[in-house]
A protein has these predicted regions:
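N-terminal beta1-alpha1 cap of cysteine-dependent amidohydrolase-like domains
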Residues: 236, 372, 549-710, 715-718, ...
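Cysteine-nucleophile active-site neighborhood
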Residues: 678, 690-769, 776, 827
Length: 855
């Protein structure tokens, strides 16, 4: 039942321009106009969120959104969501509780006038559901969806803002159970905004916007806040960024020495040293790196991002945020004040964006950094600059790691987009800034009509730059070896608006502050040829900017103990130790320097509401969607894709769907009977003599470890009744099922290889059209084979004898060791189209045994 929409009153007030929203928030806390909580030595804000965007190329402020009053606080822990009414908005909070209880009655487990507890168990991940059904099943994200969809007559409201922990992934995917560590951020914590402040810095304008069912109280609160903002704007004080942030200090060449002078300590006065202590020592972290490399060699992952933390005192998190904002302005600046913790950061990298205006979702991976070619006087030496760009573009390791992240982003966007709309709008563009240049790509797609922005966000969790690939196996390794929850680190901060606008950033270059101490976490991207000591040093480089901001906020300089050798002559990030140009490799947990967001980039800046967006009254009730795009007449070739927990599965799905075929996705953790049932021809298919095609996806590890994979392949080979194509791990499963063996052939990840098409391949339906020219293919594997069993014929091999493609001599079974779906395989779509079309050709023998009858 859809409840009668609440009729909130909307109040807007143009107010005096506040150039520094962080200082304004401090002022409002002192005057009691925002929620506050007492901590030793001060009163700090609570239940507020500050989101800011800074153009770091010019250091000009762009946009600020501040949640000054919230109606409710939503906290997710596991499958439980607690919704609490906040004291400054009791009427609105009570209305929200009533709306949620009415819309989600089956999930209510406890209710008082001040609190509602919901339980939303996750959809099973045992493979029993087709993947689209699983993605759109009810989840703990439903309360956010429903509150954001309430009808308010204003483009900026309704709005929910907050943080998703890295560990939110474990609420809908099976990850090892680990204890809570120093970062106690819940799975998510969001606020339903009642009054927000929107600041447009380029026009030096600001507006208070509020919505409430208690119009009189809202008018009074907005008027109080307007007067306070005007009073604050008239206070004398240092000029802060209406157009430019203060110029940051030069990068230090190493840990500061006791007794060195420091700003704020007076001329010649020594600054105290504040020591940051690592949560994991050098030797232990290097051992973690080596363990990760063993997993890479075993074919479990292509890359993985372990992390460690650094702790130091932090009595005033908002002061630390101010220091970070001035020294390291970034596209995504954030400060979140919750009852038990504060979270601050300056992130350079978006997580997932959804534009309500265009209906597009986008991911922008950043990986690969070089210094600008600066001359002795600090100006750009264009000749040197060009040489450094060429070095960046041609560095095999940089390019391979960047391509891996691009293929991963293509997968995540394809999973939630209309087939055929996913595209790489920028591939390895070199963006230049004042001190560094980066490789940047962008992947966009049109969001599928049966999904919304929150579905897309869950489908893309977590970002590959903080996890690795394949994501799920990498996340399992991260949890097992780090041994505790990551909390906010590697999660996302941002907002969701009523029209569906979603703007989130990755929580990196951040500090989690609780009980007077800051925890700053940083990771290192581990690949096969990583140097463990250098990866440990990389975490120091990445944490330093935030640690220095925390120290400066206390009038101190930073000490950080052991300094390991540099990972690269140009170590990562704008904030590195020992790099006067602030340059680096920064391929994971990006530490880019200045980046100017594109006009459509969110960067915590509100974009215009979509003029054709549906109103909240048109929003469907939860649960609201099921299944894949239907094929009512049963005319399309049907492909049943077995997902072996890979991060490129939806690149295959999108490619197959653009060929006009219907795709159903089941996880390899499904019972074999579930997949066998999906492979049975429908009556319409039987009438046309058509059989579904089984597609075996890539995946981590050995084929024998991937659920029902081997059982299905053995049956397909034995019966010859199921046309089958295997990719990478799927190819290896075919080799094993036919009596061959796969083993280590050396890690090759994100690399293009030129292969030789054999005589059999030149006659094969899939490869014959391409046999006249070179065949360049993408490889992501550590396992493979150089010797095929008698039942398989090689179609393509590498120069060192690794088999890249093979076909069964009798059964309609073909395997590709390479990845046709990758951007590195130019002829991949043509190969897959020819292959699946050939396998799906109608047959006349309707008496062939079914796969079900053999098992």
């Amino acid at each position: 039942m859809t409840p009668t929409p609440l009729p909130p009153r909307v109040v807007t007030r143009a107010v005096a321009y506040p150039p520094d929203a962080g200082r304004l928030l401090e002022h409002l806390a002192r005057t009691g106009l925002v929620g506050t909580v007492g901590v030793p030595g001060r009163t700090r804000p609570v239940d507020t969120v500050l989101l800011e965007s800074v153009d770091t190329a010019t250091k000009a402020s762009r946009t600020t959104i501040a949640v000054l009053q919230a109606s409710t606080r939503l906290t997710c822990e596991g499958d439980a969501v607690t919704v609490e009414v906040l004291p400054q908005a009791r009427a609105d909070g009570a209305a929200s509780l009533e709306a949620l209880a009415t819309r989600l009655p089956a999930h209510v487990t406890a209710r008082t006038p001040e609190r509602l507890t919901l339980s939303v168990p996750p959809a099973p991940d045992d493979g029993s559901l087709e993947e689209r059904e699983r993605l759109t099943a009810p989840s703990t994200i439903e309360p956010l969806r429903l509150l954001a969809a309430r009808k308010v007559d204003h483009p900026h409201l309704p709005l929910v803002a907050g943080v998703f922990a890295f560990d939110y992934l474990a609420t809908f995917e099976s990850l090892p159970a680990v204890p809570t560590g120093g970062n106690t951020c819940p799975d998510y914590l969001f606020y339903e905004a009642r009054i927000i402040l929107v600041v447009d810095h380029p026009t030096r304008s600001a507006t208070l916007v509020g919505a409430s069912v208690d119009g009189a109280d809202l008018e009074a609160r907005v008027e109080e806040l307007a007067e306070a903002v005007t009073a604050f704007a008239s206070l004398p004080g240092p000029a802060t960024p209406s157009g430019r942030a203060p110029t940051p200090e030069p990068a230090h060449s190493g840990p500061e020495r006791p007794g060195s002078a420091h700003p704020g300590c007076g001329p010649g006065r020594p600054a105290p040293v504040l020591e940051a202590r690592p949560t994991v020592g050098e030797a232990d972290f290097e051992a973690v790196v080596r363990t990760m490399q063993e997993a890479i060699s075993a074919g479990e992952v292509y890359q993985v991002v372990p992390s460690r933390g650094f702790t130091l005192p932090c009595p005033d998190a908002l002061a630390a945020y101010h220091e970070l904002r001035e020294a390291n302005p970034s596209p995504y600046m954030f400060y979140l004040a919750a009852p038990g913790f504060e979270l601050l950061g300056a992130s350079p990298e978006s997580a997932l964006l959804h534009s309500a205006r265009t209906g597009e979702v986008s991911i922008r991976p950043i990986a690969g950094t070089r210094p600008r070619g600066l001359g002795p006087e600090g100006g750009v030496d264009h000749e040197r600059d060009t040489r450094l760009e060429l070095e960046l573009r041609t560095d095999a390791k940089e390019v391979a790691e960047h391509v891996m992240l691009v293929d991963l982003a293509r997968n995540d966007v394809a999973r939630v987009s209309v087939p055929g709309t996913r595209r790489v709008t920028d591939l390895m563009r070199v963006d230049r800034y004042s001190r560094v240049m980066h490789l940047v790509s962008e992947v966009t797609g049109t969001l599928a009509p049966d999904l919304d922005a929150l579905d897309a966000f869950r489908a893309s969790m977590t970002m590959g730059t903080l996890t690795g690939a394949p994501k799920l196996r990498a996340a399992e390794l991260v949890r097992a070896l780090e041994g505790e929850r990551r909390g906010s680190y590697g999660g996302s901060v941002g907002y969701l608006r009523g029209d569906g606008e979603l703007d989130t950033c990755i929580v990196i270059r951040s500090a989690f502050v609780a009980d007077g101490r800051a925890l700053v976490q940083a990771g290192a991207g581990v690949v096969a040829d990583s140097v463990p000591a250098a990866e440990a040093a990389e975490t120091v480089h990445k944490a330093r900017a935030v640690l220095e901001a925390v120290a400066r906020s206390q009038g101190a300089v930073l000490g950080i103990g052991h300094r390991a050798p540099s990972k690269d002559p140009t170590p990562a990030g704008d904030d590195v130790v020992g790099s006067p140009t602030g340059a680096g490799t920064g391929c994971h947990e990006a530490t880019p320097g200045p980046r100017t967001p594109s006009p459509t980039a969110g960067a915590h800046g509100p974009r215009p509401a979509a003029p054709t967006a549906p109103t909240a009254s048109e929003a469907p009730t939860a649960p609201r969607r099921t299944g894949s795009t239907p094929d009512p007449h049963g005319l399309r070739t049907r492909v049943v894709l077995l997902d072996n927990r890979d991060s490129f599965v939806y690149n295959l799905v999108d490619l197959i769907a653009t060929l006009g075929m219907q795709v159903e996705v089941y996880r390899s953790s499904a019972p074999a009977a579930t997949v066998r049932s999906a492979l049975e021809p429908t009556p319409a298919e039987r009438e046309r003599g058509q059989r579904p095609v089984l597609c075996l996806s890539p995946g981590p590890g050995h084929p024998r470890d991937s659920g029902c994979l081997m059982e299905l392949v053995r049956a397909a080979v034995a019966t010859s009744s199921v046309p089958t194509v295997g990719i990478c791990l799927g190819f290896q499963a075919i080799v094993e099922a036919c009596g061959g063996r796969v083993g280590p052939v050396g890690p090759v990840h994100g690399r293009s290889t030129r292969v030789e098409v054999t005589a059999a391949g030149r006659a094969d339906a899939a490869l014959a059209p391409l046999a006249g020219g070179p065949l360049d293919v993408a490889r992501y594997h550590s396992l493979g084979t150089r010797a095929l069993p008698a039942d398989l014929t090689a179609l393509a091999v590498t120069t060192d004898g690794v088999v890249m493609a093979a076909r069964h001599v009798d059964a309609p079974v073909v395997g590709l060791q390479f990845h046709p779906e990758s951007v590195l395989t130019p002829h991949g779509p043509a190969i897959l189209k020819a292959l699946v079309t050939d396998l799906a050709a109608p047959v006349n023998d309707a008496t062939a045994p079914s796969i079900r009858s053999t098992l």
